[in-house]
Amino acid sequence: MAGEVEFKGKGQALRLGIQQELGGGPLSIFGAAAQKHDLSIREVTAGVLTKLAEDFPNLEFQLRTSLTKKAINEKLRSFDPRLGQALFVESASIRPDGGITEVKDRHGNWRVILVGESKHQGNDVEKILAGVLQGKAKDQDFMAAGNAIERMHKNVLELRNYMLDEKHFPYVVFLQGSNFATESFEVTRPDGRVVKIVHDSGMLNRIDRVTASSLSREINQNYCENIVVRAGSFDHMFQIASLYCKAAPWTAGEMAEAMLAVAKTSLRIIADDLDQN
């Protein structure tokens, strides 16, 4: 799978390599650093990788920063020569901000076990707390939600193409900000005025813009294991992204726990192909 390898190894050697590169923060995401909000998803992924190296010392893992469109097309052509034909930019790739975590199976193949992304959209809470009005005339409490978050669908679709021969789909997306509130709540401005964030407001909420990636299944759940659904006379295997949404920032510990659960689900599903002895 083409793409730059950031970390690679097994057991203690992998842990030491990550510590040397990133310091001790990622190593403590299940402890002292669990409540931090300032660790990037790249650092959280590195911390999850150290935990995997600790729990599965005989398995070799690697973290890639990207997956090229060329590699995706090669995989598609291996399924059917009619697929994977269109490529205009040789260097085209997807680069999930949490990277692509893989494990080497007993046949020497690298298998994707975790892909993570973290997106923020909607700064209304921060603006209200600061007493800043928004809009062109600077007379509104809220800014109409944008559509930037919809770009995540491209990465999800590309990874689906790459993993059509797998029984798992370990794509995790953490969405945060006022555009992803799952319940209504109140925020007080510095002047004492109380503003209500309404979670089902069409002006603010953008969760419905992303649930196509999860076939509108419930949010905040691990959907790593694919499901087979009967539609008419056809059976379809669905690859469903695991979407985690809330208005407040996700802590490093919350992201790490969800990502570790997805990675371990992947390892369980492909266990027969792994050499853990």
Swiss-Prot record:
Major enzyme class: hydrolase
Cysteine disulfide links: none
Family: Belongs to the EcoRI type II restriction endonuclease family.
GO biological process: DNA restriction-modification system
Keyword DNA-binding attributed: no
EC number: 3.1.21.4
Keywords noted in UniProt: Endonuclease, Hydrolase, Magnesium, Nuclease, Restriction system
Name of the protein this chain belongs to: Type II restriction enzyme RsrI
A single GO molecular function term of this UniProt record: magnesium ion binding
Keyword Hydrolase recorded: yes
Subunit: Homodimer.
Higher taxonomy: Bacteria, Pseudomonadati, Pseudomonadota, Alphaproteobacteria, Rhodobacterales
Alphabetical list of SUPFAM superfamilies matching this protein: Restriction endonuclease-like
One Pfam entry name: EcoRI
Catalysed conversion reaction: Endonucleolytic cleavage of DNA to give specific double-stranded fragments with terminal 5'-phosphates
Cofactor requirements of the protein: Mg(2+)
CDD domains: EcoRI-like
